[in-house]
């Protein structure tokens, strides 16, 4: 049987909250239970990844707090930022645990801010296959588009205009003009197989040409999570109900990346 790999990937923009701790516990417990159920040489890995692409709100203090809280809860990750050992005390007076984390499979680094070169490689692949494109809309233009949609009582959905000049846009990108990179959504239904909710179909109008890379050069959550889950070999994704509507974007991206002549298969993990 293949290995089971789960992950918990918090954003260090504040304290670990009860919902995040619950998700981490489920991911940890599922990995441990699957290894026991399968027996023999079956292996499971619970990894911790820090999604710190929001540079304005992320902080080292929040990272330290999240890691210490998880360690205090005895939710110990197999791979991820290494902490513990001599001198580590998650709460006053506590005994330091054995070292937690590491990179046995060499899939790190585990901080997304340290993985920008990796994301840019996949952005380049997608640009080369017209699966992504530069967009130069100003904030005022986007606000006007949203207002026009609201006036028509339509849900706002960004789509590339039929008059879009791809060659000219790529030239502007190469010249260093500030822009975002958007996903060229193929307008096809997306089918999500959820282990808890069953099969769900999302129609094209639920997915727009969402941003993959922001103007500051950092990836969005949607892009980075798909790349990292693939490269880190994540097989099962347990997430809160609030992330259900994000899933079709991720499945659509996985499908597109399978077509982008990359060096990865971009398998769709089990969602629950």
Q: Where do the protein language model's features map onto the residues?
A:
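Active-site cores that bind ATP or allylic diphosphates and position pyrophosphate for catalysis
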Residues: 86, 128, 133-270
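N-terminal Rossmann-like or analogous alpha/beta NTP/dinucleotide-binding catalytic cores
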Residues: 1-149, 216, 245-266
